[in-house]
Regions:
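Gly/Ala-rich beta-loop-alpha elbow adjacent to hydrolase catalytic centers
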Residues: 46-50, 54
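Active-site catalytic motif of lipid deacylating hydrolases and related acyltransferases
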Residues: 1-42, 79-80, 84-99, 178-182, ...
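Short beta-strand immediately N-terminal to the catalytic nucleophile in serine-hydrolase-like folds
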Residues: 44-46, 74
Length: 204
């Protein structure tokens, strides 16, 4: 038996309060997940910025001795590379979009549907997420929960080639690469789903 819990960033027009830090979102979701059936194996998954939220939830659960079967990070930026990410998002909107198109870093299908104002809001949120990542404090010790790290073969070399740095934050890490860039979740979702299901089946 399986249950899926998901969290989506605030969108234009919804009335939710914006959470400005990884810790705020992690605390909110951790409290919700504690209400889940304890008999159901729990896996935490994050993409890009949400990888840090997944880590924060996992950290909180380990501190309270609540078991998690595994954590899955897709396109996660290791903590020591956060300044590089901040440098990228310090560009103006047009420069950021041009660079993204060349590197397949952002969701171009979504961006194409947005007005100029909505594009600015979208990029502003990405910048705020990046600031939240830079400000987040990781533990000095390694988490016990096994990590499955997944990146695209065409992702930013700085991210793709430094996934081994997650070994500094988890006792056990398995590394995987799939076709595509940073947004492989939109173009290679079938391959991604197969890899994730295989990982889950190995850890239940």
């Amino acid at each position: 038996m399986e249950k899926l819990f998901s969290w989506e960033s605030k969108k234009k027009g919804d009335g939710r309060e914006i959470k400005s830090s990884v810790e705020e979102v992690g605390a909110l979701l951790a409290n919700e997940l504690k209400e889940a059936d304890k008999e159901i194996p729990l896996f935490i998954m994050g993409y890009s910025y949400s990888c840090y939220i997944a880590y924060d939830i996992c950290k909180r659960f380990e501190q309270e001795n609540i078991p998690i079967q595994g954590i899955i990070m897709i396109g996660g930026t290791p903590p020591t590379l956060r300044d590089d990410l901040m440098q990228f998002f310090s560009n103006d909107d047009n420069a950021l979009l041009d660079y993204s198109r060349a590197k397949d870093l952002l969701n171009e299908e979504l961006i194409a549907t947005l007005s100029d104002e909505e594009k600015h809001e979208y990029l502003h949120e990405l910048r705020m997420n990046t600031v939240a990542m830079v400000n987040y404090k990781f533990l000095d010790c390694k988490l016990k929960t096994p990590l499955c790290s997944i990146v695209g073969r065409e992702d930013e070399p700085t991210i793709r080639n430094n996934q081994h740095l997650w070994n500094n934050y988890f006792q056990k890490v398995s590394f995987h690469q799939l076709p595509g860039g940073h947004v492989l979740i939109t173009k290679y979702h079938a391959e991604l789903a197969k890899l994730i299901m295989n990982y889950i089946e190995l850890h239940v």
